[in-house]
């Protein structure tokens, strides 16, 4: 890492965190906790000045070809800086045609283009690629609730990746292979771990602190002239690999395929490759349905199909859990009490909250194979397999 990159990283882990934390305490002490205007202006000015002074020499260096990890780390630091400026209303895409922070934008665009990723901070920067130093990883603030959010989101993502890795190993083996049973059980166990970490997250995370002091750092902002949506907890390939390999979601569903396209550049290149790779495989649901007429009485089918259904059930449970206990409780219900003047750009993804809520509800019910009359889910096909193996008997 160059001296300039090292200096920025050190600042991001110290003064940057301290200033954001101080601002959050000022905001949170107000009657209107969502207000940031006219609060802590001296701190905000220092945040801008110190950050820009450290970024200028880095921008002069450009992408120094020191490998993916170095470049992605620098991009993350630039992105965290811009996200903090957006949170404190020092930049806002609604009132600008381009970012007022030219140096950070220029370097971010350079690195993003060279790596094939969006030129802003992404979920991976605070999750799977968030290097801890002396036991402390990067964050916006020193608030305990932010670390609860970062830690248990990261654990959930890693468990999803374990499940996806197990399922990706099934197609070369075939659904009747004895080793497939082990892999399906591995995937189920990993998804059960997702539910366990979700439960800890929802129990320990304070709703007010999350809504007012953590969530606002995940808003859209401009890099150069382009506005980029905020980082989303689902910006990794594992959860979609599971959707597609199980057959609960389909790539030929226009709404779902649009989701895949929209998130592609917000994932690391390795994840982009993994997501593309899983698109060539016939979903396991279809394979078990095709085999059922001739194999439902055979031991391999009974064991492997039941294990497959357990994976589907675990995936659906985690999806319902996340939607109902995090999104509904920590965002939708909290926003109901928010002054309407703060509703603009409430969500990380950009669209109004009711639009986002409808899209996420649809995704939840696809993953849960829920019975819906207004769109097709895997409900009927899953019920057919359950009857074939005597599920619940």
Where does each model-flagged region fall?
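Surface-exposed peri-terminal alpha-helical interaction modules
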Residues: 1-393
